[in-house]
């Protein structure tokens, strides 16, 4: 079963329609989880089911589109954070706090939707590759900051960065999902992994 959109919107009106359909899908998936249907999504968006099917063949395609947007938001937040850290140059604890805050926002703004995407989105090779690309980008940026703050040098920076990113992701998905204090809790957890560098 193909889980990609039927057609890509080219005109602004079509893009607006897709945006409305995906926001409606997000709301219905948040509320109903796996029980969500394309009929309820179309009704929520104010469109006919025929209009929905012009763009999405089934709800799995909508899940994939929502997941793609979530990953794109992750890249955007990471790029903005990288620029901010390059300008502000905080110490290591401040850097960890900045990363933890951005990671937490991605998971706590709409926690029920995030949980649905994590559990129900079809695992395609393209989707796995997209997630890996975001993970690798985060690891690369953390490694840059480890070197900048003098916490790690050489190949050790990549290893430590991978450990920190993996820990952050696992902690947010399995322990802190939906916790409004996730950023503070995650900051403490990540700093505790390297207590000798806490004050650098």
Say what each PLM segment does.
Residues 3-9, 35-37, 45, 59, ...:
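Short glycine/proline-centered loop/turn elements that form peptide/ligand docking sites
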Residues 65, 79-108, 160-164:
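Hydrophobic alpha-helical connector segments
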Residues 1-16, 85, 200:
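N-terminal intrinsically disordered/low-complexity leader segments
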Residues 21-29, 70, 74, 103, ...:
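Short hydrophobic clusters on alpha-helical segments that form packing/core surfaces
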Residues 83-89, 109-114, 120-125, 135-161, ...:
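Hydrophobic alpha-helical bundle segments that form small-molecule/ligand-binding pockets
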Residues 16, 20, 24, 28-61, ...:
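Helix-turn-helix
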Residues 63-70, 134, 138:
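Alpha-helical DNA-contacting segments of helix-turn-helix folds
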Residues 119, 128, 147-191:
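Hydrophobic/aromatic-rich alpha-helical bundle segments in the mid-to-C-terminal region
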């Amino acid at each position: 079963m193909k889980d990609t959109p039927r057609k890509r919107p080219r005109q602004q009106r079509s893009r607006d329609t897709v945006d409305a359909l995906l926001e409606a899908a997000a709301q219905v998936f948040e509320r109903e989880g796996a029980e969500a249907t394309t009929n309820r999504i179309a009704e929520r968006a104010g469109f006919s089911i025929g209009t929905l099917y012009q763009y999405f063949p089934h709800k799995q395609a909508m899940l994939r589109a929502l997941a793609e947007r979530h990953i794109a938001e992750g890249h955007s937040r990471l790029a903005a954070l990288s620029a901010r850290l390059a300008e502000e140059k905080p110490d290591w604890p401040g850097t960890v706090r900045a990363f933890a805050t951005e990671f937490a926002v991605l998971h706590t703004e709409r926690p029920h939707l995030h949980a649905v995407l994590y559990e129900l989105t079809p695992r395609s090779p393209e989707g796995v590759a997209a997630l890996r690309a975001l993970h690798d980008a985060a690891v690369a940026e953390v490694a840059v900051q480890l070197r900048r703050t003098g916490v790690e040098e050489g190949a050790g920076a990549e290893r430590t960065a991978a450990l920190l990113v993996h820990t952050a992701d696992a902690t947010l998905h399995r322990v802190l999902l939906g916790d409004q204090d996730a950023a503070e809790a995650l900051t403490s957890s990540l700093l505790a992994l390297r207590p000798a560098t806490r004050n650098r």
